[in-house]
Every structure is written in structure tokens, then in C-alpha cells.
């Protein structure tokens, strides 16, 4: 009875409990029931326990909701993990030297990289992309084309990976800054190394042929008759491509369609590096001032004329400027492919000043003095080597110390005098460095090369100063120079100023004497050179042009690429590019590029790296894998193409495997023939060749005499034979059928179109004008009325006025045939037609056009038609 009575009560209680009710208070209910728990009646005990359980459950639900609320509002425990994410997000900020670019609908990573003159890999690195896929509206960081890297961006770092200077700089910051925790210093320094401005490092450029697997070279494309265009040559294991600069004057004038070319690597038959161009036509179009390879390359070579002493002084003054002014230039030149490897720079660094000395200078706070120390140390080392009068060791050290002090005082007083003194000192030291033992150890052919040797040494000295300058110290020097101009002078005492002034005067008088002697020597050399080379009043112009020619050969080499078929143009459609390749199939496929001298070794190493083995492992068969083989001199074929001058001008050449074996076979055959001729041995091949030649001469005339359905009133038999040799192969063997003739069908263009109905062969139109001249055109399709031009590259025009001449398709455009009810035209471009006829077939006109590159076919541009014949091949 107790259970039956209590069970409905429990159900009623459980139904009345509402957790979400606003007036429900489980604590109050529990407080009311607690005194009843001590009462003796047993039947009420289950009800009290149930109420207590309900109260306990209701207390758990609010705590669960609070945990959810705490989870979504982030408490201190969750902030630790999310702080890491936020820090990671905040660390990816906009890199220096970049701008934001919003991806458009038709953009891809390759097209964006091409638009901003970079590579897809660099965009992936800059934006930390996980794939190469981009979506419309995505914001990417791209290199800013107008950004000029400052001194703070190190020229020895690349955006791809932090190099050894970065890590050493980070370690250096750890040791010199004890207040900064090491774990905080390392990521910040590494981040600045990974995300600098878009600067190509010297080391990464040296290694890009082996790590990046492509070469990107600023060069000039030397065309045949269309000028010389600057651009970028991209060499990969699969393709070779030249992309012209859009700011080039010829590109702006003619468009980039003429100059953008590419070809697969397997089409390259040979790649050779020459000291000079062998093709006379291309050599004539080569500008003399090609030494200006790009806007930044070799920016000071243009100033050199050789015999002008003032220009020599200005060049050496430029080379002797302080590092604060030359640091931005070194950064720019690292962009323009000036390459110095770490192995090349390390002996210079050891010779100039040790890293311990630099660290000591930097840790003492004299960053400006350390920068001056690098320049002055080089000055001192060169001066000590070249000095004929011995300088004591203590004087050298005092002089070095004093010049450093002079460098720190130059911002306070007597600024102009001190700057002039430092420049003059550096001019003198440059002269001394050249006139010392280095001049004796370097092989100089005659006195005429002394001026060029002086220029090379000054350039190399300037480059070594720029490359050896630690970027961190240069940046710190620039900052302290701009901020603490007044403080540096106050730090020096009066005694050091007096000592520095005395030593500066002593040093100036000593070096100016040697400067004067060196100037006199240079003037004597230039006068001797002028006497030998100048024979007229224009001698100065000739000598300067000759010096420019020497500079060009010294600064550039010429890359010649010979390919199996013409390179495809990249800025035209696929159909147009294919048709242009077909049009140029009979031409010589050579492409010349002016390449900086320091990049020639990179090209050679790149071609050699991707060369396969000559033979397979087990069998004696040749491998079909594409690659290149170095051509040795004993393996070169003595053909007409390979003259002695060409062999002398060529530095190296690599050829494809197929070309290599072709040359070997040609060499063996030629040597065998030469031996037989010398021994007067008649071979079976000679006998057969003579017999075949006579048989061919007899058969040629018969094979090129087609059968005509009607006798021609305009063409003679020999003219028919000449025309037959140039007809498309699909017409050979078919008889000639006269489908239209003015004497048979009348003079009407509409009648001409009607006679063409149902034909499916090329047609040959022969015209005779009132002057008795015979000319015409071959149409690849039957003539018809069309809305636009039609036809293929088989179309050509010809003339027998005064001699037989055929003008085939040049590939410039595809304006082959155009038919209207009122006119018929062949060729086009520039508003002119190669051949134009009116609707009455009475009046005609001929003019040169781009489609065929023809001259005027008739004797006069305007002519009157006397007779027309049209032949089909069926």
C-alpha cells in the first residue's frame, strides 16, 4: 500500500519539476526538507531522497552551462594555445618590397609571376602558400616593381632561405645584446632574413643552377633586322624562353609579339658561347653601346673613354666613395646579376679585416668607425703593397686609427675639406694598388691595355668593397649617421683632432705626389696609343669607339642557340605561332643573345649538369634521353660552317646527343674522303655519285613536266618547269586542268567564282598584263567569296619580271586570300596587297606586303590585265 500510494506522488513530483522555471530554487527546497529527514516515519524517506537527488541534479546543470560559456568566452587556460596561433598569424606580416595584389578571374600563379617579373616559387614562399592554386579575390603579396631596396635589406639574403650571413648576424646579436633573451632574438632575426625586400642574393644566384634548377639572366636578344631588345632569358631543364622588358623602346614601338620566343630543350641542337658575333648581318645591327646591358648593370662603365684624365679621376672617385653612398648601389647590382660567391669573398675578407675586429668595433658602439675601418683597411693593404718608400708599422696603425677618427669628425666641422681629403686619399691608394706588385703579376699585353686594366681593377676594387661590407654594420652606420651627427664630434677630444689633422696632411702630401706621377704615366700611355691608332682628325672618336668595343667584349659574351626548328613566339596565339614556325622552316635557325660575362660559367654548368651518359649501361646503343655533350676541338667537323675564325672566337660549345653523333659521322666521312683524294683512290661512292648525277639531270626535266589538259597561252615549257618545283607536294603527279581563261570564259569575276564550284585542289592563277609581263599567285584553296581572309601557308606569289622569283609566306600575318564580288586580293598588311584585281578583271595593282615579303610583281604598281589563266590539279 505504501508503494502504491507513493508511486503516484513521485510521478506528480517528477512532472512538477521544471529546471527552466524562473521561480524554481532547488537550494530553498533542499533547505526545507533537511529538518524532516530526522523524523522517524519511514514512508516519507523515499520522497525526501528523491527530492535531494533532484536538487543535486539541478545544481549540476548550471555548472555545465557555465563550463560551455567559459569555453566560448576563452578563459586563461585556453589563451595559451590561442596566443600561439595569434602570434603565428601576426608573424606573417607584409614583407618589405611587396605590394598587395587581388587575384582576378583569369589569373593563375604563373600569369601573376610573369606579370610582376618573378617566379611562381617565389610567390609561394612570399605568401606561404600550401599549393599553387589561387582563387578569385585572394590577396597575394607580390614584389613591388618600383621598390628600391634600402641599406637595411641585406644584399646577401634571398627570400627563399636564410643564408649563412643571416645566422651569423643573429648569433652576433645574441652576444652583443645581453638584455635580449636568446629565444626572442633568434626568431626576429631569422624573420628579417627570410622576408627582406625582393633581393636576389649573390649566393643563391650562384647556386640557382643546382638548387632552383633554372637560370634567370638579364640579357639582350639580338635579332636579324628588327633591333636589339633587352629582357630576361629563362633557362630550365625543359625549355628556353626569352621574355622582353615592356619598357624597352623597341617593345613599346613594335609590341612584344616580335621578341617573345621559346622552344623546348630537346629542340636545341647546340649552344655555344662566342667572344664576338660571327653572323655579319647580325653584327652590323649590333649597337656599340651594348655594354649597357640593363638599367643597373655596369652603370659606371659608360663613363670610361680612356684618354680623358678627368673622366679617369671621376671614375676612381666614384670607386673610392664611402660605404654609406655605395651600399644602395651594391644592393641594386646584386639584383642585376653581379655574382660573387662566398668562396671568392672569403680571402678578401681575411686580407682586409678579421671578423673579430669587426665585432669588437661594433660591440664598442663605433659602428661608423668600423665601416671606415673596412675601407681604410683596404686602402692601407693596397698602399703597403705598392709603396716604394717603406712606411713604419706604427705609422700605418696610427694612420689607420687617425683616418677612422677623421671619419667620425666629418659631420661636425670642416665637412667639405675632410670629404675631399678622404676621396683624394682613396684615389691615390687606388693608383698605388694598381701600380704595385699586382700590376707585375697580371699579364698585360702592351701599353695599350693598361687603361682597360686600370678600369677593371677599379671596378673589381669597388665591387669587393661593396660585397665585403656587412649589411648590419652598414645599416647601423646609416642610422647613427643620420641620428647622431652632433654627438660623434663631441665624443672626440681635442688631442685626437689635432693628431688626426696632422696625419691627414702628411698622408695627403705623400699620396698626392704618387697620384700626380700616376696621372702623368696614364697621359703618356694614352698619347702613345693615340699616335698609333689615330691617323686623321677624328682620332679621338676612333679611340673612344675602340675602347667601347673592348669593353663590350670584356663585359659581354654572345650566346648562340641553334635549334632544329624555329622558336615559337609566346605572345601570339597557338595557331599563329604554329603557322609562323611553318613559314620559317627553310631559314637558318640561329638565335644570338648578349650575356653578361659572369653568367657564362653558369650557363655552361647548367647545360653540363643536365647531360645524360653517352651510352646505356649494358647495351652499346645510344640513349634517347635529351642532354648535352661538350664538343672537343679534335671532334669538330671541318665544314664550311666551322671555320678557323669561328673556332678561335668560340669559348665553349655543348651539343645535343643527336648532333654530336651527326658531327662524328660527318667528321669520319670527311676524313675518309680527304684520305682517298690524297691517295688518288677512286671509291665506289664517287662512281655512283657521278652516275646518279647524270641520271638525275635527265630525269629532272621529265619529272617536272606536268601534263596539261590544254596548251597554255601564257606560260612557256621552261617556265612551267620552274613553277612546278615550288608547288605544294600534294599537287605533284596530277595533270594541270584549265578551269578558267579569259579567252574562253570572258572577263568577269563572278564567272571566275562559278567555275571554282566543286573544286577541292589548289589553283594556280597566271596573269599577263599590257606590258607583256607574266606573274601570278598560287592559292591553297579554290577562289571564292569570303567575309575575311582564308587560305594556308602554301599560298605564294611569283613573277617572271624580269627573272623568275617566288615569294612564299613570311609568317608575319595570315592574310592569304580575300574574295569579294567586286575584287580579289592576295596578301595584305599595312593597307597594301601583293596582288589585287577588280571585279571586271581589267585593272590590277601590285605592291609589297608583309604576308609574302614580296616586291612589286609587275613593272608598275598599277597595270591593265591582258589575259588570265587559272589551272587546277586534278
Swiss-Prot record:
Regions of compositional bias (Polar residues) in chain numbering: 363-391, 510-527
Biological process (GO), any one: negative regulation of neuron apoptotic process
Start and end residues of each stretch annotated as Mediates oxidative antimutator activity: 551-578
Residue(s) carrying Phosphoserine: 91, 201-202, 204, 294, 334, 336, 346, 496
Stated family: Belongs to the OXR1 family.
Gene coding for it: OXR1
Low complexity bias (residue ranges): 151-169
Species: Homo sapiens
Known role: May be involved in protection from oxidative damage.
The name this protein goes by in its record: Oxidation resistance protein 1
Chain spans, region Disordered: 1-89, 151-194, 299-406, 431-537
Highest taxon in the source lineage: Eukaryota
Membrane-spanning ranges: none
Amino acid at each position: 500500500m505504501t508503494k502504491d500510494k507513493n508511486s503516484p506522488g513521485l510521478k506528480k513530483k517528477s512532472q512538477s519539476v521544471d529546471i527552466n522555471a524562473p521561480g524554481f530554487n532547488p537550494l530553498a527546497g533542499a533547505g526545507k526538507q533537511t529538518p524532516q529527514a530526522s523524523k522517524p516515519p519511514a514512508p516519507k524517506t523515499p520522497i525526501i531522497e528523491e527530492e535531494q537527488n533532484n536538487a543535486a541534479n539541478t545544481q549540476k546543470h548550471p555548472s555545465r552551462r557555465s563550463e560551455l560559456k567559459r569555453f566560448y568566452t576563452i578563459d586563461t587556460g585556453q589563451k595559451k594555445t590561442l596566443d600561439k596561433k595569434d602570434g603565428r598569424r601576426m608573424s606573417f606580416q607584409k614583407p618589405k618590397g611587396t605590394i598587395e595584389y587581388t587575384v582576378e578571374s583569369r589569373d593563375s600563379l604563373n600569369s601573376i609571376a610573369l606579370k610582376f617579373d618573378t617566379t611562381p616559387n617565389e610567390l609561394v614562399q612570399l605568401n606561404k602558400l600550401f599549393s599553387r592554386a589561387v582563387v578569385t579575390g585572394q590577396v597575394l603579396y607580390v614584389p613591388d616593381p618600383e621598390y628600391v631596396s634600402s641599406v637595411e635589406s641585406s644584399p646577401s639574403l634571398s627570400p627563399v632561405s636564410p643564408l649563412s650571413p643571416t645566422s651569423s648576424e643573429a648569433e652576433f646579436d645574441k652576444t652583443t645584446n645581453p638584455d635580449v633573451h636568446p629565444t626572442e632574438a633568434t626568431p626576429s632575426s631569422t624573420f628579417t632574413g627570410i622576408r627582406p625586400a625582393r633581393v636576389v642574393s649573390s649566393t643563391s644566384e650562384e647556386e640557382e643552377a643546382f638548387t632552383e634548377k633554372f637560370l634567370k639572366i638579364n640579357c639582350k636578344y639580338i635579332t636579324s633586322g628588327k633591333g636589339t631588345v633587352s629582357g630576361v632569358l629563362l633557362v630550365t631543364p625543359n625549355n628556353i624562353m626569352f621574355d622582353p622588358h615592356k619598357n624597352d623602346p623597341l617593345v613599346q614601338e613594335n609590341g612584344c609579339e616580335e621578341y617573345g620566343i621559346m622552344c623546348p630543350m630537346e629542340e636545341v641542337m647546340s649552344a655555344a658561347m662566342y667572344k664576338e658575333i660571327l653572323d655579319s648581318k647580325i653584327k652590323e645591327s649590333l649597337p656599340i653601346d651594348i655594354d649597357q646591358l640593363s638599367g643597373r648593370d655596369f652603370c659606371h662603365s659608360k663613363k670610361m673613354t680612356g684618354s680623358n684624365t678627368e673622366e679617369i679621376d671621376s671614375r676612381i672617385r666614384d670607386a673610392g666613395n664611402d660605404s654609406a653612398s655605395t651600399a644602395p648601389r651594391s644592393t641594386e647590382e646584386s639584383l642585376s646579376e653581379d655574382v660573387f660567391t662566398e668562396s671568392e669573398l672569403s680571402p678578401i675578407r681575411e686580407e682586409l679585416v678579421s671578423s673579430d675586429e669587426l665585432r669588437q668595433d661594433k660591440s664598442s658602439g663605433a659602428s661608423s668607425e668600423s665601416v671606415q675601418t673596412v675601407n681604410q683597411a683596404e686602402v692601407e693593404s693596397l698602399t703597403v703593397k705598392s709603396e716604394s718608400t717603406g712606411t713604419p708599422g706604427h705609422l700605418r696603425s696610427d694612420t689607420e686609427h687617425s683616418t677612422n677618427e677623421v671619419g667620425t669628425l666629418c659631420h661636425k666641422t670642416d665637412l667639405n675639406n675632410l670629404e675631399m681629403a678622404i676621396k683624394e686619399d682613396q684615389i691615390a691608394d687606388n693608383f698605388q694598388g694598381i701600380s704595385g706588385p699586382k700590376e707585375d703579376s697580371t699579364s698585360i699585353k702592351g701599353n695599350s691595355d693598361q687603361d682597360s686594366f686600370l678600369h677593371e681593377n677599379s671596378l673589381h676594387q669597388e665591387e669587393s668593397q661593396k660585397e665585403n661590407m656587412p649589411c648590419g654594420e652598414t645599416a647601423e652606420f646609416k642610422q647613427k649617421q643620420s641620428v647622431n651627427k652632433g654627438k660623434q664630434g663631441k665624443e672626440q677630444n681635442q688631442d685626437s683632432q689635432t693628431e688626426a689633422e696632422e696625419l691627414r696632411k702628411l698622408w695627403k702630401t705623400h699620396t698626392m705626389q704618387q697620384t700626380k706621377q700616376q696621372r702623368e704615366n696614364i697621359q703618356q700611355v694614352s698619347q702613345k696609343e693615340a699616335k698609333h691608332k689615330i691617323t686623321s682628325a677624328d682620332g679621338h672618336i676612333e679611340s673612344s669607339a675602340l675602347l667601347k668595343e673592348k669593353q663590350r667584349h670584356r663585359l659581354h659574351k654572345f650566346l648562340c642557340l641553334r635549334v632544329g626548328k624555329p622558336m615559337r613566339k609566346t605572345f601570339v596565339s597557338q595557331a599563329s605561332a604554329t603557322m609562323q614556325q611553318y613559314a620559317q622552316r627553310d631559314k637558318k635557325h640561329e638565335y644570338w643573345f648578349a650575356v653578361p660575362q659572369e653568367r657564362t660559367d653558369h650557363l655552361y654548368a647548367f647545360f653540363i649538369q643536365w647531360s645524360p651518359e653517352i651510352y646505356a649501361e649494358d647495351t652499346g646503343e645510344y640513349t634517347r634521353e635529351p642532354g648535352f655533350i661538350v664538343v672537343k676541338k679534335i671532334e669538330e667537323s671541318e665544314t664550311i660552317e666551322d671555320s678557323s675564325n669561328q673556332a678561335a672566337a668560340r669559348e665553349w660549345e655543348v651539343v645535343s646527343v643527336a648532333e654530336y653523333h651527326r658531327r662524328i659521322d660527318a667528321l669520319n666521312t670527311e676524313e675518309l674522303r680527304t684520305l682517298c683524294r690524297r691517295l688518288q683512290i677512286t671509291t665506289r661512292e664517287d662512281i655512283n655519285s657521278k652516275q646518279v648525277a647524270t641520271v638525275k639531270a635527265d630525269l629532272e626535266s621529265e619529272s617536272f613536266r606536268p601534263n596539261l589538259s590544254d596548251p597554255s597561252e601564257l606560260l612557256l615549257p621552261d617556265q612551267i618547269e620552274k613553277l612546278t618545283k615550288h608547288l605544294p607536294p600534294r599537287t605533284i603527279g596530277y595533270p594541270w586542268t584549265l578551269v578558267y581563261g579569259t579567252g574562253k570564259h570572258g572577263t568577269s569575276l563572278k564567272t571566275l567564282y562559278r567555275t571554282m564550284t566543286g573544286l577541292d585542289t589548289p589553283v594556280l592563277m597566271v596573269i599577263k598584263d599590257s606590258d607583256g609581263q607574266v606573274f601570278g599567285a598560287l592559292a591553297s584553296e579554290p577562289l571564292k567569296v569570303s567575309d575575311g581572309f582564308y587560305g594556308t601557308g602554301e599560298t605564294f606569289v611569283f613573277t617572271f619580271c624580269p627573272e623568275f622569283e617566288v615569294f612564299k609566306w613570311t609568317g608575319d600575318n595570315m592574310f592569304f586570300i580575300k574574295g569579294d564580288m567586286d575584287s580579289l586580293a592576295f596578301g595584305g598588311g599595312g593597307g597594301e596587297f601583293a596582288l589585287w584585281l577588280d571585279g571586271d578583271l581589267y585593272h590590277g595593282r601590285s605592291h609589297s606586303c608583309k604576308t609574302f615579303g614580296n616586291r612589286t610583281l609587275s613593272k608598275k604598281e598599277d597595270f591593265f590585265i591582258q589575259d588570265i589563266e587559272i589551272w587546277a590539279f586534278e
